[in-house]
From Swiss-Prot:
Signal peptide: none annotated. InterPro entries: ARID_dom, ARID_dom_sf, JmjC_dom, JmjN, KDM5_C-hel, KDM5A_PHD2, Lys_sp_deMease-like_dom, Zinc_finger_PHD-type_CS. It comes from Drosophila melanogaster. The keyword Zinc applies. Disruption phenotype: RNAi-mediated knockdown impairs habituation learning. This is Lysine-specific demethylase 5. It comes from the Eukaryota. SUPFAM superfamilies: ARID-like, Clavaminate synthase-like, FYVE/PHD zinc finger. Belongs to the JARID1 histone demethylase family. The modification Phosphothreonine is found at T323. Changing E639A: Abolishes enzymatic activity. Inhibited by Myc.
């Protein structure tokens, strides 16, 4: 709402609900006829520039309008208003909301958020002197918020008004933007504008200085219907109060009785008497929505008779009729107290709101000369002023009233009311004094003691005197009669009627008693809202507040009072916006001070008409501010002079608005009058007073369009001309509003003045004066304003001429010029219509102070026309001159207007082009011509023409004539012929000429011609049609931009024609139709053709028959392809193929079936030939036949049978491969089963021989011969390979699979005799499987034999496994290469088995076996039943150079080897290959067993056994006889060739050892490069020339050891016996070594050692010596040099061997020599005595030097050394070969647990020993010489 809008709410205005009667207003601002001064007139228009008025401060109407906004607390306030309540728009919330600045002088805006403004509200006027001052109360509510009532109350929310969001560019010009949106927003009456996010003005009010007195609003008194009810109840209560009783509202059906509704319904039914007579009380109860019950009607009747009927009687005058004077009257007076109910407290609306009429200085009318004494009301009107009917109502005096009342007493049926009727005044006068004395009506003094009813003076004790008029009455004459004298004041019936019917005072808003600061008001407002809703203010939804507001205003029993700080003048308090005159503006504030949207600048813009008014009209061209709280409302109103208004909400909670479009204003006013006729009957101008509100739902139910919006902080709300609007505040907020008037308002402004004249409403300013002022200064006007002013002034001048002419004709001849602009507005208004006069007026000689306008000169007075004088401002000649000045300004507009009239005239032929029309429209926009219907029509015409051009361009009509017929573009849009005709008509009706119109007309002609030709072609039959003619016609139609129906028909016809002729052509040709052609033709026919055409139908039937025949044949052919066909059925297929010739089409599968038949017959012939062969067919031949048969489409039964045979063969082959082939092998099954084609290594790429013989189809005899030949060749090749391998020289030949030099640990294969590196072949445990390692399980041997991977190619299954496979072969009807190979292999194995058994059964061999068994039994007896594992029996004495064999049982390694399979380890003693050059090389003597064997077996038998062993090893089958042979041959000495090969290896290793000058590394066996342990075959120790050697253990001191439980624990090993020591050495070593330091034994060899010493050592257990025999198990190693004495810092002990210089060979003990990969030999004999000594000396010297250098800085070699400290630290040295030192603590040993004869082996050497253990049988290993007792001790130590 506008500034004025809200302000008018607070003006003292006539109360629509104050009473039913009207009276004369006593204020100076009220008219004499009782017409209320409009609320707008309470505002003052100041004449001076500083905004001051000579009178009191200007006051604005009090009508609150805004929408809820975020509550904001100004700086310095303690209230919390920084929250954003629900409903705040995101656009506003995105901007920070700072507090209001503290000091306006220092800072006009807060640094953060600048708050936003809302709408104007009413300003109170002080109560007049002498009036009873109403008691002011703080805002309160009689009832607390009830959620249930709120939800039960039904309120239909009106639709939202439009919301506009201007861009930054659009926001620059507010009036232009408002004009732009006016066409949309004006339909709703209100609109909301959201500024750009960058626009955030500061809040410039000085909050410390701002103090204001708000107005009090009682919400339920605002609503029209509620006010009527309250007024009625107040009259009833007052009536009974004057009767000495208090009114109590009775309860009916547990609800308070609505007395007003009951009274209204009863009156509508004809009154109480008629209702009772017609028995309508039940109907009355129904209409009041009570349940249907007789008792309710009777109850209502009783209440009506008791409460309402006496009131009716008194007010109608019937009560004053004479009654019988009987003192004994038995009538019982009615007592209201008897009815019970709720006490009614009168609202006293007239008393509370007796606000004095505003002084003229407080009005909004302009006072340009400060005439504060001039009255704006009608107080100056003399009593002789002739009242106007319906406006001025006579006010009777009290005497006249009494006289009339007395005269009515004499009329028995007098029903006339003695009350005068009339409109209420604008302001309230002082209430009439109750005790006023009426003039005497009776001269006789006794008359005053006579009853005025019975006219008798007797019964004085019952005589009552009225306290109002002193009349006397008998108590029994009264109706109802009184039983006693009432206490207190008593009024007679006349005074009661007079008092009750006293006219109501004008209704207005009461002024609060206290003054608020902004902070105090905010605290009060927030406290009220929080206490009312019982929740924080920001958590209350706007919908809930809205529904509660309308519930409260419609309730008569809930009193809610709020306060509203409305109409705060910016001239007095400053504006919320920074202004140009503000002091100390911040740099950022200057932009907003000059902004066009600043409400201080907006009304005065160049395009605003209000800028031409010199005076400051507060609230209209000077903004007003409003401080709202929850429920504070502004009532329904529209703006003064129907101007625009703009409202800005600076900050705070939202403001809710409701608006009605200006076009529906009259409908709105009529609805309001119908809803509350009692108010409008006494106050016709009620809507001008801004004191009445009505629920929008009532308006909506009467089809009045209502729109709503919620205005948030930072948002604008615009109201449009004559748009009624109202609203309320959601909470504490601050708003600012002002009016403005753009050029388009000027026409509405004149209509408003005429409307005001009919309503007798005062104007705020003179409209004619404003127009004339602008006409006098046309240069200052914009073109738009000048044009609008010219149009308005032309109308004004025409009207003035007519009025003056009428006045002249009436007879007025005198005239007088007067400058009306110098006269106060209150002195120049028409006495009839209150219009402010400016151009002219009429005065009379009888009263020169009164004037009227020229429309009402006849009602001025009754004098003759000659006495009247015309007062004028301008002559009739001057006004056209003024008009001409405007015309010159608007001359271009006039010319433009004249030309436009001709263009839009439908009867005038147009010659204007579209370009000229667009130029005219552009000229109107550029020169800002005022909006008019002509401009709208012109713009519409231009738009229509542009649309036509656009359509033509989109259709491409103008391109039709320029394109080739064969290069058509698909038109995006096309018109039908009907649309094209209408389009041509539209082009012809345009206001301009468009160049493209000719093309459209030509197109229409071409379209009509095409239609005619198309129709003729469509009538022809298919046989008569020509494709070329149809195609040509279609191309022509496609080139036209027309949607032609005939074009689709032609295209369909063309398809039919093409299809028909194609089908006929295909059928009539010599070749048959293919099935695909038939399908395509039928598909096209079904999809695109019309089957109803006879030609098409006939052709389709023929094609369908052909297709059916082909499908039937194809279906039968498919069966032949799918089913299993036998040979005799092929003839049936051949007959079926012949039937295809009877079909008129080509059968697709004919050729395929014919070819399949041919192939099937050929394949069956080939199978028949194959079956005629004498031998069984090979598998690969059968596979080829099956593959060939699978390519035949026909399923042959013979093929399925052959596939079954082939699958059985493959299954047998898989089973055989599973039995023979190892996992991951690269040998094929055939290669494994056949003899070796070449005795070659695995990596050989030579192609195997003899394999092709098995793949070729040969008879069985030939295959067996080939296999035999392959066997013989295999034996020859193997012998040659063995010879080559044994003749290899380690120094120059290559070994192993990798073809590299002889190095590190080497394994010797017992079959091919080649040497293999440890890391090139699988470990021995991997090959020590059943069937691979032969001879390790019998009682006569403990040493397995090792075969290389090249020699062991398969799993070597036992013969029992092979036999089931051979049985399965008998069931296979086909042959396999593997089949033949397996048969030959089985036959070969059984043949060898027979020969081996024969050889083993000979007497000599049997005797040898018995000797071996006897030896084993003797050894077991000598060992005392000890296990075979780690125990070695003592050897018998032997001669020097003899060969001895010692077998050691398998040993379990629990510490490092996870393999649960027992490993058989063969300990090889050193061969007696002497390194002494002087000693002759002779064959060593054999032991007792060897000698016995040599005696028992002849050379031929031995050779036979060796050949059988080699041939058995070649077999890929495991046989028991191979083990028996191995047990015999392992005891044989090596052959001469083997011995020579071994000697070469030993010599090579000796040279390698001599080349190493540095001591051997101690890091582990894996780091050694000069130590190698190899194993020879069992016959390597034969007497044919092998080198021998002896070895003896060197004595040493014992060392404590135990099982290491730490990370370095190792397997402890005990020695077999304690070697001899020098006397005193052992004790000294044990005593002196506190840290358990020890000295490694020094190993030395003595070439001159004799056999006795050696035998003595062996027998005494102190020396472990053996010969290098053992069936090929002799090995060459690098002997370990003797260890030197080690020193420790704390304690050191040196131990010497007692026989260092006595032995020729160093004994390799398991605790002092390396195994497998270590640098020392393990239990072998080597002819390296001298080198051993040399090595020992070198090592001794080096270790001694190192010990001296390192001294006690040597570190513990444990992986996780704990660095123990203390006086004594115990150490231990490894005996496993690395000779490293360890802290006992670090390896988990305890000194008390170690015995002197224990050895310690570290974790590294333990792993090395484990590796040697796995390699036993083919590599050198540590000899275990522990005695059984000590062995048990070691086990217990573990």
């Amino acid at each position: 709402m506008s500034a004025k809008t809200e302000a008018d709410n607070t003006t003292a205005a006539n109360s629509g609900g104050g009473g039913v009667g009207s009276g004369t207003s006593s204020g100076g601002g009220a008219s004499a006829n009782g017409t209320a001064t409009p609320a707008r007139r309470l505002r003052t228009r100041n004449s001076t520039g500083n905004g001051t008025n000579s009178g009191s401060e200007s006051v604005k109407k009090s009508n609150a309008n805004d929408e809820p906004s975020t509550p904001v607390t100004p700086a310095g306030a303690t209230g919390s208003h920084t929250h954003a309540p629900p409903g705040i728009s995101p656009a506003v919330m995105e901007r920070p909301m700072p507090s209001v600045p503290m000091n306006h002088a220092s800072s006009s805006v807060s640094a953060s958020k600048k708050y936003h403004n809302s709408c104007p509200h009413p300003t109170p006027t002080p109560a007049p002197t002498g009036h009873k001052k109403s008691v002011h109360t703080q805002p309160h509510s009689s009832n607390k918020f009830d959620q249930g009532k709120n939800e039960e109350f039904h309120f239909d929310t009106p639709p939202e008004c439009p919301v506009f969001r201007p861009t930054t560019e659009e926001f620059k010009n507010p009036l232009a933007y408002i004009s732009k949106i006016r066409s949309i927003a004006e339909k709703c009456g209100i609109a909301k504008i959201l500024p750009p996010a960058t626009w955030s003005p500061p809040f410039a009010v000085d909050v410390d200085k701002l103090r204001f007195v708000p107005r009090v609003q009682r919400l339920n008194e605002l609503e029209a219907k509620t006010r009527v009810k309250l007024n009625f109840l107040d009259q009833i209560a007052k009536f009974w109060e004057l009767q000495g009783s208090s009114l109590k509202i009775p309860m009916v059906e547990r609800k308070a009785l609505d007395l007003y509704t009951l009274h209204r319904i009863v009156q509508e039914e004809g009154g109480m008497e008629q209702t009772t007579k017609d028995r309508k009380w039940a109907k009355v109860a129904n209409r009041m929505q009570y349940p249907s019950s007789k008792s309710v009607g009777a109850t209502l009747k009783a209440h009506y008779e008791r409460i309402l009927h006496p009131f009716e009687v008194y007010t109608s005058g019937k009560v004053l009729g004479p009654t019988p004077t009987s003192s004994g009257s038995g009538s019982t007076p009615v007592k209201l107290e008897d009815g019970g109910g709720t006490d009614y407290k009168a609202h006293e609306i007239p008393t509370r709101q007796q606000i004095a009429p505003p002084n003229e200085t407080n009005t909004r009318r302009s006072k340009r000369f400060g005439n504060s004494n001039a009255s704006c009301g009608l107080s100056g009107v003399t009593p002789t002023t002739k009242p106007s009917a319906g406006v001025f109502v006579k006010t009777e005096t009290k005497e006249e009233f009494k006289r009339d009342l007395l005269s009515s007493f004499n009329a028995v049926n007098s029903g006339g009311s003695p009350l005068a009727t009339g409109t209420t005044a604008n302001t309230r006068g002082a209430s009439q004094k109750k005790g006023g004395e009426p003039p005497a009506l009776i001269v006789d003094p006794l008359m005053k003691y006579i009853c005025h009813i019975c006219n008798r003076g007797d019964v004085e004790e019952s005589m009552l005197l009225c306290d109002g008029c002193d009349d006397s009455y008998h108590t029994f004459c009264l109706l109802p009669p009184l039983t006693s004298i009432p206490k207190g004041e008593w009024l007679c019936p006349r005074c009661v009627v007079e008092e009750v019917s006293k006219p109501q005072e004008a209704f207005g808003f009461e002024q609060a008693e206290r003054e608020y600061t902004l902070q105090q008001f905010g605290q009060m407002a927030d406290q009220f809202k929080q206490e009312y809703f019982r929740k924080p203010v920001h958590l209350v939804p706007t919908e809930m507040v809205e529904r509660e507001f309308w519930r409260i205003v419609s309730s008569i029993d809930e009193d809610v009072t709020v306060e509203y700080g409305a109409d705060l003048h910016t001239m007095d308090h400053g504006s919320g916006f920074p202004t140009k005159s503000s002091l100390y503006l911040l740099p950022g504030d200057q932009e907003y001070a000059e902004s066009s949207w600043n409400l201080n600048n907006l009304p005065l813009l160049e395009d605003s008409i209000l800028g031409h008014i010199n005076a400051d009209i507060s609230g209209m061209n000077a903004p007003w501010m409003y401080v709202g709280m929850c429920f504070a409302a502004f009532c329904w109103h529209n703006e003064d002079h129907w101007s625009y208004s703009i409202n800005y909400l600076h900050w705070g909670e939202p403001k809710t608005w409701y608006g009605v479009p200006g076009s529906c204003a009259e409908q709105f006013e009529e609805t309001m009058k119908q809803a509350a006729p009692e108010l409008f009957s006494s106050q016709p101008d009620l809507l001008h007073q801004l004191v009445t509100i009505m629920n929008p739902n009532i308006l909506m139910n009467n089809r009045v369009p209502v729109f709503r919006t919620d205005q948030h902080a930072g948002e604008f709300v615009i109201t449009f001309p004559r748009a009624y609007h109202a609203g309320f505040n959601q909470g504490y907020n601050f708003a600012e509003a002002v009016n403005f008037a753009p050029a388009d308002w000027l026409k509405m402004g004149r209509e408003c003045v005429n409307h005001y004249s009919m309503l007798r409403r005062f104007c705020v300013f003179s409209h004619d004066e404003l127009v004339c002022k602008m006409a006098l200064e046309p240069a200052k006007l914009t073109f738009g304003i000048a044009t609008a002013c010219y149009i308005d002034m032309a109308e004004m001048v025409d009207t003035e001429k007519k009025l003056r002419k009428s006045l002249l004709e009436w007879g007025v001849t005198r005239a007088e010029r007067r400058a009306f602009e110098l006269v106060n507005d209150d002195e120049r208004h028409c006495q009839e219509c209150n219009t402010t006069c400016f151009l002219s007026a009429v005065a009379c000689e009888c009263n020169d102070k009164l004037i009227v306008c020229l429309r009402h000169y006849t009602v001025l007075c009754g004098c003759a026309p000659e006495k009247h004088t015309l007062i004028y401002r301008y002559t009739l000649d001057e006004m056209p001159l003024m008009l001409q000045k405007l015309k010159v300004k608007a001359h271009s507009f006039e010319r433009w207007l004249s030309r436009c009239r001709d263009i839009v005239d439908a009867h005038t032929p147009t010659s204007v082009t579209l370009q000229e029309l667009q130029e005219l429209c552009k000229e109107a926009e550029t020169k800002k011509f005022p909006s008019s219907l002509l401009i709208d029509r012109l713009n519409a015409a231009a738009v229509e023409a542009e649309k036509c051009v656009t359509v033509i361009q989109q259709l491409g009509i103008n391109k039709v004539r320029t394109r080739s017929d064969h290069n058509q573009e698909a038109a995006q849009y096309k018109l039908t012929m009907e649309e094209l005709e209408l389009f041509v008509q539209e082009i012809d009706n345009l206001c301009c000429i468009i160049d493209e119109g000719a093309s459209v007309r030509e197109l229409l002609v071409l379209g009509k011609q095409f239609v005619e030709r198309s129709e003729s072609q469509l009538q022809l039959s298919l046989e008569s049609l020509e494709e070329s003619e149809l195609e040509t016609l279609i191309n022509e139609g496609s080139s036209l931009r027309i949607e032609l129906q005939q074009l689709d028909l032609l295209q369909k016809r063309l398809k039919q024609c093409k299809w028909y002729k194609r089908s006929q052509g295909l059928r009539e040709t010599s070749s048959k139709l293919t099935y695909q052609d038939v399908k395509n033709l039928l598909h096209i026919a079904a999809a695109d053709l019309d089957p109803t055409d006879p030609y098409v139908d006939k052709e389709m039937r023929k094609l369908q028959q052909i297709g059916a025949d082909i499908e039937a044949w194809e279906s039968q052919a498919a069966k032949y392809f799918r089913r299993l066909t036998q040979q005799h059925e092929l003839g049936e297929i051949e007959q079926f193929l012949k039937s295809a010739s009877d079909i008129n089409g080509q059968v697709p599968s004919h050729g395929l079936l014919k070819d399949a038949l041919r192939k099937a017959r050929e394949w069956l012939r080939a199978v028949e030939q194959l079956q005629q062969n004498n031998h069984v067919t090979y598998c690969h031949t059968l596979e080829a036949m099956i593959e060939r048969g699978l390519n035949i489409p026909i399923q042959l039964e013979e093929l399925s049978r052959m596939q079954g045979h082939l699958n059985s063969a493959h299954q047998w082959k898989d089973n055989t491969a599973c039995a023979f082939l190892k996992k991951g092998t690269f040998y094929t099954l055939l290669e494994v089963l056949m003899p070796r084609s070449d005795a070659i290594n695995i990596d050989s790429d030579l192609k195997p021989r003899f394999q092709d013989d098995f793949l070729k189809e040969k008879n069985p005899a030939e295959i067996v011969a080939s296999f035999k030949h392959a066997e013989e060749q295999e034996l020859l090749d193997m012998r040659e390979l063995r010879r080559q391998n044994m003749n290899k020289n380690p120094m120059r030949d290559m070994f192993c699979l990798c073809k590299s030099e002889f190095r590190n640990l080497m394994f010797n294969c017992q079959l091919c005799r080649d040497w293999f590196h440890e890391d090139c072949v699988p470990p021995p445990s991997a090959t020590n499987q059943n069937g691979i390692v032969n001879g390790g399980s019998g009682p006569g041997t403990n040493r397995p034999k090792w075969l290389c991977p090249s020699c062991v190619r398969s799993k070597r299954p036992r013969l029992e496994t092979i036999l089931p496979l051979l049985v399965q072969l008998q069931q296979l009807p086909i042959r396999l290469p593997e089949d033949e190979a397996l048969r030959c292999l089985a036959e070969r194995a059984m043949n060898w088995q027979d020969r081996a058994r024969k050889a083993l059964s000979s007497p000599d061999v049997s005797a040898a076996q018995e000797a071996i068994m006897a030896q084993q039994q003797q050894k077991r007896r000598s060992e005392g039943g000890a296990g075979v594992g780690n125990i070695s029996s003592p050897r018998k004495p032997r001669r020097r150079g003899s060969l001895t064999k010692e077998a050691s049982g398998s040993t379990e390694s629990d510490a490092d080897d996870d393999d649960d399979e027992d490993e058989c380890r063969l300990r090889i003693v050193e061969d007696n290959f002497s390194n002494d050059e002087d000693e002759p090389r002779t064959a060593p003597a054999t032991s007792t067993v060897n000698s016995d064997l040599l005696k028992l077996l002849s050379d031929s038998e031995i050779e036979n056994l060796l050949d059988l062993m080699m041939e058995g090893d070649l077999l890929e089958v495991s046989l028991d006889e191979t083990q028996e042979l191995w047990r015999i041959l392992e005891t044989m000495p090596p052959t001469l060739l083997q011995a020579e090969a071994m000697e070469r290896v030993v010599q090579y290793m000796q040279r390698q050892r001599q080349q190493h000058t540095n001591p051997l590394p101690t890091s582990g066996a894996e780091d050694s490069n000069d130590s190698l342990m190899v194993q020879n075959s069992p016959n390597s120790n034969s007497n044919s020339g092998g080198a021998t050697g002896s070895a003896s253990n060197s004595g040493r001191n014992k060392k404590r050891r135990s099982n290491d439980t730490g990370g370095n624990s190792a397997v402890p090993r005990k020695k077999q016996s304690t070697p001899k020591q020098t006397p005193g050495k052992k004790g000294s070593a044990a005593a002196a070594r506190k840290s358990d330091a020890k000295a490694s034994p020094a190993a030395s060899t003595t070439p001159g050692a004799d056999a006795d010493a050696e035998n003595k050592q062996a027998n005494g257990g102190n020396t472990n010596s053996s010969t290098g025999s053992g069936g090929g198990n002799s090995a060459t190693t690098t002997p370990t040099p003797g260890s030197t004495h080690k020193k420790r810092k704390r304690t050191s002990t040196t131990a010497t061997n007692n026989n260092n210089n006595n032995n020729n060979n160093s004994t390799n003990n398991s605790n002092s020599s390396t195994n497998l990969n270590s640098n020392t030999t393990s239990g072998q004999g080597a002819a390296t005595g001298g080198n051993n000594a040399t090595g020992g000396q070198k090592k001794h010297a080096q270790r001694s030097q190192q010990a001296a250098q390192e001294d006690d800085e040597e570190e513990c070699r444990a992986e996780n050394c704990h660095k123990p400290t203390g006086r004594e630290v115990d150490w231990v040295q490894c005996d496993g070969g690395c000779n490293e030192w360890f802290h006992m603590y670090c390896v988990g040993l305890n000194r008390s647990q170690i015995k002197p004869d224990d050895d310690y082996i570290c974790i590294r050497c333990t792993k090395t020993v484990a590796i040697g253990t796995q390699g036993s049988g083919h590599s050198m290993s540590v000899a275990s010489t522990t005695t059984p007792g000590k062995q048990r001790a070691v086990q217990s130590a573990r």
